[in-house]
Regions:
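Bacterial Sec-dependent N-terminal signal peptides
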Residues: 1-47
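Carbohydrate-active catalytic/glycan-binding domains of CAZyme proteins
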Residues: 38-385
């Protein structure tokens, strides 16, 4: 007996004597099975598509992200203010499922506060993390480096190598970044020309290194805030810092497709504002990188806010290859609201996009895309297990 809402509809006896109904039920059953099969196939395709794509942000928060690709794995870090964490993964787009370890907790009061912009590097088989820290007064920020001689940075122990003296007066220094060029190791960073009095001007400096923790040359300024888009420090709502701050910071090395042009990307204007953006310096690969005349600055930002898509302050770049080496990706920070309080990190989060190359072989960063936009994973990605 088949009932619906307590009412008898028909019985097995009726079915046996009703050929039409029997045929109808057979067709109905076939239709249901076909629908289930189609839905299963569609679900499978959807799951496959989701496995092959990702969306930004990589984390809900995490300013100043940095990553490198080494021996089949990505090593990633971002700013957490009072300690340093390191993540390892085979899938840079699936950071919540990566392995994380706290690798540094400062003990010296002189460098236990405001740990900014950590950068992970492998130099001559050893692991180094560069960062800036202070004694509680941000005016006293200096650059520090820690070292781990284990082949695996998630093992062993990071030990303090010391502060890097960027100038005899120990003027302010933040956002260190190293790169190798023609067999030489260089350090880029953001610093003050002189001790701040009334206002603050952050400039980009470069020096050649004797070893990963010591400079071999005096610092050379290669950029200072000069264009209007580099000197924004007041938010649209009127919010501002206690004094004017003109910003060039977060320098990061990259190169043209043929490696004949050295590129330094940097962040400009206040990170608390929607005007935070990315500038670009270029030099011929055969030029003297310690000669300021070797460097040319783009008169316009090369990566900036897109308010109509809810993307503000895209900057703080680093570059990583796809696992198979056929693609390059830019890792950067941005926020989904126009403004943040000075020093606030919670509204900034890490994002990843594939870059292209223009007709001259220069990187084409494109435009910062809205969050939750499905994007193809880097070529050759092995999903986290």
């Amino acid at each position: 007996l088949l009932t619906v809402n307590g009412k008898k509809v028909f019985s097995l006896y009726h079915l046996k004597n009703n050929v039409t109904m029997r045929i109808y039920l057979c067709l109905l059953s076939f239709s249901v099975l076909l629908n289930i099969s189609c839905n299963s196939k569609h679900a499978g395709k959807t799951e496959d598509a989701e496995k092959d794509t990702y969306v930004n942000p990589l984390f809900t928060e995490g300013p100043n992200p940095n990553a490198i690709y080494h021996d089949g794995k990505y090593y990633y870090t971002h700013e957490t203010n009072d300690q340093i964490f390191l993540w390892v993964t085979t899938d840079i787009t699936d950071m919540p499922r990566s392995t994380c370890k706290e690798v540094w907790v400062p003990k010296d009061p002189s460098n236990s506060y405001h740990l900014w912009n950590p950068e992970i590097r492998n130099i001559d088989g050893k692991w180094y993390i560069y960062f800036a820290a202070d004694d509680g007064n941000t005016d006293n920020h200096q650059i520090y480096v820690i070292e781990n001689d284990s082949p695996d940075p998630m093992q062993g122990e990071f030990r303090m190598k010391g502060a890097i003296m960027t100038n005899p007066e120990w003027n302010w220094g933040i956002h260190p970044s190293t790169f190798e060029h023609k067999g030489e190791l260089y350090l880029l960073w953001s610093g003050w020309p002189n001790r701040r009095i009334g206002s603050e001007t952050q400039c980009i400096y470069i020096a050649r290194m004797e070893n990963p923790w010591t400079l071999a040359t005096k610092r050379v300024m290669i950029s200072q805030p000069e264009y209007e888009w580099e000197r924004q420090w007041i938010n649209p709502d009127g919010g501002r810092t206690a004094y004017p701050i003109y910003v060039n910071e977060s320098p990061q090395y990259f190169h043209s497709k043929d490696n004949q042009t050295v590129i330094v990307y940097y962040s400009a204007s206040g990170c608390w504002s929607p005007y935070y953006c990315t500038g670009m310096l270029t030099a011929d690969a055969d030029s003297d990188l310690l000669n300021p005349a070797s460097w040319k600055k783009s008169p316009v930002p090369v990566f900036q806010q897109k308010p109509e898509d809810g993307v503000y302050g895209p900057a703080g770049l680093s570059f990583i290859p796809s696992p198979d080496g056929t693609e390059w990706y830019v890792l950067y920070q941005a926020r989904s609201i126009p403004s943040g309080n000075t020093g606030e990190s919670e509204t900034r989060n890490p994002r990843l996009q594939k870059i292209g190359w223009d007709a001259n072989g220069m990187p084409d960063l494109g435009i910062p895309l809205p969050v939750n936009t499905p994007l193809p994973k880097p070529s050759g990605t092995v999903t986290n297990q």
